[in-house]
């Protein structure tokens, strides 16, 4: 117990006690919930939509599959999954209830409420039985988890044999010059956009810092394999600004 309370982790570029991170992340997303989808479009100039389509292309949802969409927030991945599958079911889990409320509103507007469950919960301690889901997705969320390896271990636990993990996350550009240009944009433009559109500079400063702190593609691939996933692979998107990681529970 003492060891856990003494452990630290990153909150952006700040080092904080592990037990504080979840609450601080929750505060960030409570603050940005109502503007989250708009800000995604503005920050990425709409490219996040292309990345999510690429995620669905690789995932190839099938009718009747059961999805667990972790850190699913407003349900963007779940809506895409269900439309591609034709019919199925998605459980959206997120630490932040206001994000889920935004998703519920959208589900009702799109007449998809019966296909979706909304659960407030922690990626490191999923409230589901072993071998429950066909697919586990986490999109732009795992970098906000206090201990990402534990989240991956939980993903493995709740997937059925033959189930698939798919992670979409910001990553690292392979070229130092391009990375410096991207950092220049990220640190100087995105927080200011957050202030202008969402009235929140600090939350978007954290989001930018959390992107920069996240492991590179090969390091994260090793974490996926360590959780037990087989045939683990990654694909770069937009030269490595983001990356997809896939693995199977065999």
UniProtKB/Swiss-Prot annotation:
Pathway it works in: Quinol/quinone metabolism; menaquinone biosynthesis; menaquinol from 1,4-dihydroxy-2-naphthoate: step 2/2; Cofactor biosynthesis; ubiquinone biosynthesis
Ligand binding (S-adenosyl-L-methionine): 74, 94, 122-123, 139
Gene Ontology MF annotations: 2-methoxy-6-polyprenyl-1,4-benzoquinol methyltransferase activity; demethylmenaquinone methyltransferase activity
An example Gene Ontology biological process: methylation
Catalysed reactions, as listed in the record: a 2-demethylmenaquinol + S-adenosyl-L-methionine = a menaquinol + S-adenosyl-L-homocysteine + H(+); a 2-methoxy-6-(all-trans-polyprenyl)benzene-1,4-diol + S-adenosyl-L-methionine = a 5-methoxy-2-methyl-3-(all-trans-polyprenyl)benzene-1,4-diol + S-adenosyl-L-homocysteine + H(+)
Function: Methyltransferase required for the conversion of demethylmenaquinol (DMKH2) to menaquinol (MKH2) and the conversion of 2-polyprenyl-6-methoxy-1,4-benzoquinol (DDMQH2) to 2-polyprenyl-3-methyl-6-methoxy-1,4-benzoquinol (DMQH2).
UniProt-recorded name of the protein: Ubiquinone/menaquinone biosynthesis C-methyltransferase UbiE
Gene: ubiE
